Amino acid sequence: MAFILRKLPVDAFLEQRKTTPVADVRSPGEYAEGHIPGAVNIPLFDDEQRAEVGTVYKKEGNINAVLRGIDLAAPGMSDKLRKALDLASGGKLLVHCWRGGMRSEAMAWLFSQGGIDSSLLGGGYKAYRNHILSDLDRERKFIILGGLTGSGKTGILRHMKSAGVQVTDLEGLASHRGSAFGALGQAPQPTSEHFANLLYDDLASMRDDEPIWLEDESRNIGTVFMPDCFSLRMQTAPVIALMMSIETRLPRLLEEYTTFPAEEIMASVMKISKRLGGDRTREAADALRKGDYPTAIRITLEYYDKAYHYGLSKRAEGQVTYINTETDDVAVNAALVMEAARNLG
């Protein structure tokens, strides 16, 4: 087949992604740092080869870098083409590199030798990142569900989502439940870069004329940092804060965390030891060693409750709507939250 070099703008590329597989031809290290969700890595160069070509470019110029790149890539061309043939759908592929330049163009030519019709991402992954960060800074109708640790916010949002409410699960995307204990039982966290890619995809499926609910989070969720632009949007959105007593929250926290080994709980407590103070940290550690989880949880909640109340006090006047509840029933509390949302100005 004749080789035709076709480059698409980001919007068109992402629209075609719904039906056409994406081959990311950057190095494995670049891909691991962040990639278009669903893209498959078929690298032109591995990480060491990419570094070598970059060094040749700096020292000897473009032509010698191209020649060295051909030397390095040529032995693996058949394997790259086989992977592309396995990935292609209906003889078509979407292909991108970092800037939409030589790497994606070279791989598109290679794939054409196997009869694959490739469309390239104009501007590459760099253009995609600029696009999504601009979109994440776009004004949306966010409503933040806040509440004290253990008040069941995640369960409430899931209940609301099952009823057709638009919800973005930030903790799910970040693989972390948002406290010193948040990594327990979770998959490895994505990079902050890839989290933003996942977040963009999630929000892209939602309607602009309906509110989007988010759980109240600080700028970082574990090791993941939200984009500054998105975090600032969250900080100015209305907050509905669910307030309940420690005794009401305690059964849920016991159910969630006592399934983990005591040493893992202990390690999580030590992460906040400076904030708890030496005496309270020792008391929590002693309680854990004795299997007295309720006491350990109460001690940690003293810190988290104080910190959360302080955070709410920093919000703008009238930004926070408080709901007091005496039950941990998810359906009941979801109804209370939705009623409060209807009364927002």
What does each model-identified segment do?
Residues 117-133, 254, 265-268, 272:
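Long, charge-dense
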Residues 67-122:
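Catalytic cysteine-centered active loop of the rhodanese-like fold, especially the PTP/DSP P-loop
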Residues 143-162:
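Glycine-rich phosphate-binding P-loop
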Residues 16-88:
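Positively charged, proline/Ser/Thr-rich regional signature most characteristic
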Residues 23, 40-42, 94, 119, ...:
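Hydrophobic/aromatic beta-strand patches that form the interior of the parallel beta-sheet core
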Residues 234-239, 243-345:
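Conserved NTP phosphate-binding and transfer environment spanning the P-loop NTPase/kinase superfamily
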Residues 163-232:
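Conserved nucleotide-sensing/catalytic segment adjacent to the nucleotide-binding pocket
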Residues 1-37, 65, 133-137, 142-148:
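Flexible, polar/low-complexity N-terminal or interdomain linker segments that lie immediately upstream
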